[in-house]
Design a protein with these regions (language model features):
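Short, flexible catalytic-loop segment of classical short-chain dehydrogenase/reductase
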Residues: 17-27, 31-32
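Residues at or immediately flanking beta-strands
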Residues: 9-11, 78
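Substrate-binding pocket helix/loop in short-chain dehydrogenase/reductase
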Residues: 46
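Short C-terminal tail/terminal secondary-structure segment
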Residues: 72-73, 78-95
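Conserved SDR Rossmann-fold cofactor-binding beta-strand/turn motif
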Residues: 11-17, 21, 83-85
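Alpha-helical segment proximal to the catalytic Tyr-Lys
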Residues: 3-7
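Hydrophobic "lid"/C-terminal helical patch
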Residues: 65, 69
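A conserved structural motif in NAD(P)-dependent oxidoreductases
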Residues: 35-38, 50-61
Length: 95
Protein backbone atom coordinates (compact mmCIF):
# COMPACT_ATOMS: atom_id res chain seq x y z
CA UNK A 1 0.00 0.00 0.00
CA UNK A 2 2.84 2.40 0.78
CA UNK A 3 4.10 2.07 -2.79
CA UNK A 4 0.62 2.41 -4.25
CA UNK A 5 -0.24 5.59 -2.34
CA UNK A 6 3.20 7.28 -2.33
CA UNK A 7 2.56 9.21 -5.59
CA UNK A 8 -0.39 10.88 -3.85
CA UNK A 9 1.86 11.86 -0.92
CA UNK A 10 0.02 9.46 1.39
CA UNK A 11 2.14 7.61 3.93
CA UNK A 12 1.11 4.14 5.09
CA UNK A 13 2.44 2.86 8.40
CA UNK A 14 1.19 0.59 11.16
CA UNK A 15 1.38 0.51 14.93
CA UNK A 16 1.89 -2.97 16.41
CA UNK A 17 1.09 -2.59 20.10
CA UNK A 18 1.99 -5.13 22.72
CA UNK A 19 -0.04 -5.68 25.87
CA UNK A 20 -1.70 -2.40 26.86
CA UNK A 21 -3.73 -2.00 30.04
CA UNK A 22 -7.21 -1.43 28.63
CA UNK A 23 -10.68 -2.74 29.46
CA UNK A 24 -10.44 -4.96 26.38
CA UNK A 25 -7.21 -6.58 27.62
CA UNK A 26 -8.66 -7.14 31.08
CA UNK A 27 -11.85 -8.64 29.61
CA UNK A 28 -9.75 -10.99 27.51
CA UNK A 29 -7.71 -12.03 30.52
CA UNK A 30 -10.91 -12.77 32.46
CA UNK A 31 -12.13 -15.15 29.75
CA UNK A 32 -11.32 -18.79 30.25
CA UNK A 33 -10.34 -18.34 33.90
CA UNK A 34 -8.54 -21.49 35.07
CA UNK A 35 -7.58 -22.53 38.57
CA UNK A 36 -6.67 -20.01 41.23
CA UNK A 37 -4.98 -17.57 38.85
CA UNK A 38 -6.33 -14.02 39.21
CA UNK A 39 -6.42 -11.28 36.60
CA UNK A 40 -3.54 -9.66 38.50
CA UNK A 41 -1.49 -12.84 38.10
CA UNK A 42 -2.17 -12.74 34.36
CA UNK A 43 -1.26 -9.05 34.13
CA UNK A 44 1.95 -9.77 36.02
CA UNK A 45 2.76 -12.61 33.64
CA UNK A 46 2.33 -10.30 30.64
CA UNK A 47 4.52 -7.67 32.31
CA UNK A 48 7.33 -10.19 32.79
CA UNK A 49 7.42 -10.76 29.03
CA UNK A 50 8.59 -7.19 28.41
CA UNK A 51 12.16 -6.06 28.96
CA UNK A 52 11.03 -3.19 31.19
CA UNK A 53 8.78 -5.39 33.34
CA UNK A 54 5.42 -3.73 32.80
CA UNK A 55 2.56 -3.56 30.35
CA UNK A 56 1.88 -0.48 28.29
CA UNK A 57 -0.41 2.45 28.91
CA UNK A 58 -2.89 3.63 26.27
CA UNK A 59 -1.24 7.05 26.15
CA UNK A 60 2.07 5.42 25.16
CA UNK A 61 0.42 3.98 22.06
CA UNK A 62 -1.22 7.36 21.45
CA UNK A 63 2.23 9.02 21.43
CA UNK A 64 3.35 6.62 18.70
CA UNK A 65 0.23 7.44 16.69
CA UNK A 66 0.85 11.17 17.10
CA UNK A 67 4.43 10.67 15.95
CA UNK A 68 3.32 8.92 12.76
CA UNK A 69 0.59 11.48 12.11
CA UNK A 70 2.95 14.46 12.51
CA UNK A 71 4.55 15.34 9.18
CA UNK A 72 7.24 17.37 10.94
CA UNK A 73 8.47 14.23 12.72
CA UNK A 74 7.81 11.36 10.33
CA UNK A 75 7.33 12.73 6.81
CA UNK A 76 10.00 10.40 5.37
CA UNK A 77 8.56 7.32 7.07
CA UNK A 78 6.28 5.05 5.04
CA UNK A 79 5.73 1.35 4.66
CA UNK A 80 6.81 0.67 8.24
CA UNK A 81 5.47 -1.32 11.16
CA UNK A 82 6.26 0.44 14.43
CA UNK A 83 6.40 -2.10 17.25
CA UNK A 84 5.44 -0.59 20.61
CA UNK A 85 5.56 -3.56 22.97
CA UNK A 86 7.98 -2.75 25.78
CA UNK A 87 10.65 -4.90 24.17
CA UNK A 88 8.60 -8.14 24.24
CA UNK A 89 9.49 -8.85 20.60
CA UNK A 90 13.18 -8.24 21.29
CA UNK A 91 13.02 -10.63 24.23
CA UNK A 92 11.43 -13.33 22.03
CA UNK A 93 14.35 -13.12 19.62
CA UNK A 94 16.77 -14.03 22.41
CA UNK A 95 14.85 -17.04 23.75
Amino acid sequence: MAIEFAPDNIRVNAILPGAVDTPMLRAGLNRGHVGGETIYDRLENLARKTVNGRIGKPEEIAHAIYFLADDTQSSFMTGQALIVDGGATARLSTE
